[in-house]
Swiss-Prot record:
Homodimer. InterPro entries: Aldolase_TIM (IPR013785), DHquinase_I (IPR001381), Type-I_3-dehydroquinase (IPR050146). 3-dehydroquinate binds at S9, E30, L31, R32, R57, R167, T186, Q190. This is 3-dehydroquinate dehydratase. Its EC number is 4.2.1.10. GO terms for molecular function: 3-dehydroquinate dehydratase activity. Pathway: Metabolic intermediate biosynthesis; chorismate biosynthesis; chorismate from D-erythrose 4-phosphate and phosphoenolpyruvate: step 3/7. The active site is at H108 (proton donor/acceptor), K133 (schiff-base intermediate with substrate). GO terms for biological process: 3,4-dihydroxybenzoate biosynthetic process; amino acid biosynthetic process; aromatic amino acid family biosynthetic process; chorismate biosynthetic process. Keywords: Amino-acid biosynthesis, Aromatic amino acid biosynthesis, Lyase, Schiff base.
Length: 204
């Protein structure tokens, strides 16, 4: 059983929020820039490059963002040039050219579960990613498909379940990342990062 990396999700509403990264004791801090009212410049993130995961989550994927494809493609490509880790949706990659090697490629299933064939295709297409992250709603059969995803090397997987302990327990099947929150949950069922860290410290 491998310990997942703790990702502490931090909504960034203004560039000043970014300085909080240095005080958050997690493996990675996810900067949720889709909450931003005043967008930071990519260069502003450089001092925290080794500690952050940048996410611009579109509304259709469960986020707060309303970005044009051109803006998002340009911003992510700037992050790539600076060597900053980011999350990019598989749905976005299907229509735009963005580097995904050693990045997080994500897919979210709100109203249905993916088939095994879809899962296989995601991991084959994005095999060079740092991790392929799949989140599924707790529909009938969700535990079975999460168990299948857990067999994929380097995968990240989670249920959109209101039960934080189930989310944590499922991550112990071998998920590379465990998403948590800093101030308030950015997704259903997240634990506070310090609570997740306390539990994992007892187990590992």
């Amino acid at each position: 059983m491998n310990r997942p990396l703790i990702v502490a999700s931090l909504p960034v509403t203004s560039p000043g929020d970014i300085s909080r990264v240095k005080d958050i004791d997690a493996d990675l801090v996810e900067l949720r820039l889709d909450y931003s009212r005043e967008f930071p410049r990519p260069q502003d993130l450089l001092p925290y490059r080794d500690r952050i995961l940048v996410t611009l989550r579109d509304r259709e994927e469960g986020g707060q963002g309303n970005f044009t494809d051109n803006f998002k493609e340009t911003f992510l490509n700037e992050l790539m040039k600076l060597g900053i880790l980011y999350d990019v949706e598989a749905s976005f990659l299907s229509r735009r050219r963005v580097q995904f090697r050693e990045k997080v490629v994500s897919a979210h299933y709100f109203h249905r579960l993916p088939s095994r064939e879809e899962v296989d295709c995601l991991f084959s297409t994005y095999r060079e990613a740092f991790t392929v992250k799949i989140a599924v709603s707790n529909l009938p059969g969700y535990r079975e498909i999460l168990s299948y995803i857990s067999t994929k090397p380097g995968s990240t997987f989670m249920p959109m379940s209101p039960d934080p302990l189930e989310r944590l327990a499922i991550s112990l099947l071998g998920s590379r990342l465990l998403y948590t929150y800093v101030d308030s949950p950015t997704a259903t069922g997240q634990l506070h990062y310090l609570e997740a860290k306390r539990i994992l410290n007892c187990l590992f």
